[in-house]
Amino acid sequence: SFQVTVSSLPKDIVRQSLKQLDSVITPDLKAAYKKHGLSVYEAITLASIVEKEVPKAEDRKIVAQIFLKRLAEGTPLGSDATYYYASAVYGGEPFPDLDSPYNTRMYAGLPPGPINTVSKTALEAVAYPSDTDYLFFVTGDDGVNHYTKTSAEHEQATRLYCKVSCATGYVPDSL
């Protein structure tokens, strides 16, 4: 982290932010990203999605692994956070069919850029994801993530654990 004052110029904030990021992304992390077929920029983009999807650090490695599997398979990431980001940036109501390159429910691959700031734990999660068979996750109304291996299990977990949030739509904490 770094300090910003009211008199800080935008270029100085960006410079400080990049310097901080450069100190976190070590050669080992860069090598790990490369093993996953990701550039540093792509890893930052994926980490930003992981960061926004799951605020709890202990869940990030599992979610990173799920998203990395989807990228490798060429299937959409399916992140609600990305279409909420698109609606906040480009205007309009957030919905899964929002036509934007940031909508990873609609388009496979990574969006054009990060959707959020990233933490060291999110960057490390992308570099060193969990090793599980999970392909899906849903965050329940209680904030607990439920991981599943099949689409049918995911639909059941959504019905059981996400009655309110999933009925009203994803509500981001901040964009």
Where are these regions (language model features)?
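Bacterial extracytoplasmic/cell-wall-associated proteins, especially those involved in peptidoglycan
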Residues: 1-175
